[in-house]
Amino acid sequence: MAQQMPSPEEIAAQLQMIRDQIAELQGVLAQLELRLRSVQAAKETVEKAAGQDGETLFPGDPELNTILKARLLEPGKAIVHLGLNVYAKLDTAKATEILAKKEDALKRSLETLKQELDKLSRTHDQYLQLLQALTAGQAAQQAGQQQKQGS
């Protein structure tokens, strides 16, 4: 038994679902990239603070709209988010290690997500080509029928 070709409407619906998935994944990708930049900035700040004693300057925001002058009360220590609203005061080497692990995990997640987006984009392109071929075939078929009726 031969498989029936899906209708253009069914393919268009599938295309829209794929587009929605792509948009959703792009949103997640943007969030992960933002988190990665945040972790990288935190790691850089901890690394810079590791050798500081006394007063130092810290960025008040990522775009450097403000710079804060601060006195380190416990040089060589940093308070790091461990997850689930749990923070720990650690030496800067351990804090940097934890942040580096978070950075690596985010990079792996980003890579996996980018691969999934690539796969969805290829699927989208295949469905789009199929829809265009079906639409062109239907148009040619209708033109042929009109020509027969005109004869």
Swiss-Prot record:
This is Prefoldin subunit alpha. InterPro entries: PFD_alpha_archaea, Prefoldin, Prefoldin_subunit_alpha. Keywords: Chaperone, Cytoplasm. It is found in: Cytoplasm. SUPFAM superfamilies: Prefoldin. One of its GO terms (molecular function) is unfolded protein binding. Signal peptide: none annotated. Belongs to the prefoldin subunit alpha family. It comes from Aeropyrum pernix (strain ATCC 700893 / DSM 11879 / JCM 9820 / NBRC 100138 / K1). Heterohexamer of two alpha and four beta subunits. One of its GO terms (biological process) is protein folding. Molecular chaperone capable of stabilizing a range of proteins. Seems to fulfill an ATP-independent, HSP70-like function in archaeal de novo protein folding. Pfam families: Prefoldin. GO terms for cellular component: cytoplasm; prefoldin complex.
